[in-house]
Design a protein with these regions (language model features):
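Long, compositionally biased, intrinsically disordered segments
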Residues: 22-182
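Bacterial Sec-dependent N-terminal signal peptides
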Residues: 1-28
Length: 182
């Protein structure tokens, strides 16, 4: 029994001290799109979409099938509600990068986009200060050069829903824009 226990402890401590940590180094960016679908007298309806971008070459984690966002009152920071958003078709898509002058090597740079939507519109009581939406996740990618410790730094994605009394207001839509920014 002593031999078994001593061998077990040697193997355990060897694995414990020699094993390498694994990090989810995959997130490279994201943004929210908020569309007001109904501006009511006491509450308003919004469609909320999150686009999340991950490194498909160096990342070791797949896109999550769902994400949970928080919606908070501006000024009070009170959590109004949380909302689960679902990955469209349960799969991300590889985004085209480059242009006529430059085509990056897909073995070095390949970005996957996950588009998340709610199953229903989000109904929020009209609040004169408005709301902010946030999503947080870990971790960034070592290819992000403007962070001190990207392997351990997360990302916060943020959007503001202004006071509905200002009129029907949605986030700006500039059409398809270059994904090379991510």
């Amino acid at each position: 029994m002593k031999i078994f226990l001593s061998r077990f402890l040697i193997i355990f401590f060897t694995l414990f001290f020699v094993s390498k940590s694994t990090f989810a180094t995959h997130i490279v960016g994201g943004d929210f799109k908020v569309t007001m679908t109904n501006n009511g007298a006491t509450s308003s309806n919004y469609d909320i979409q999150l686009r999340l971008y991950r490194d498909d070459v160096n990342g070791i984690v797949n896109m999550p099938s769902t994400v949970t966002i928080g919606i908070y009152q501006i000024g009070t920071n009170i959590l109004e509600t949380t909302k689960v958003l679902y990955l469209d078709n349960n799969i991300g898509t590889i985004v085209p990068l480059g242009d006529a002058c430059f085509s990056p090597n897909p073995a070095v740079i390949r970005v996957e986009e996950g588009v998340y939507n709610g199953l229903t519109s989000t109904v929020l009581p009209n609040f004169s200060m408005g709301y902010y939406i946030q999503y947080q996740t870990c971790c960034r990618n070592a290819s992000v050069t403007n962070l001190a410790d990207p392997d351990n730094d997360g990302i916060s994605i943020f959007a503001i829903i202004p006071d509905p009394a200002l009129g029907q207001n949605s986030s700006p839509d500039f059409g398809n824009y270059p994904n090379d920014a991510y």
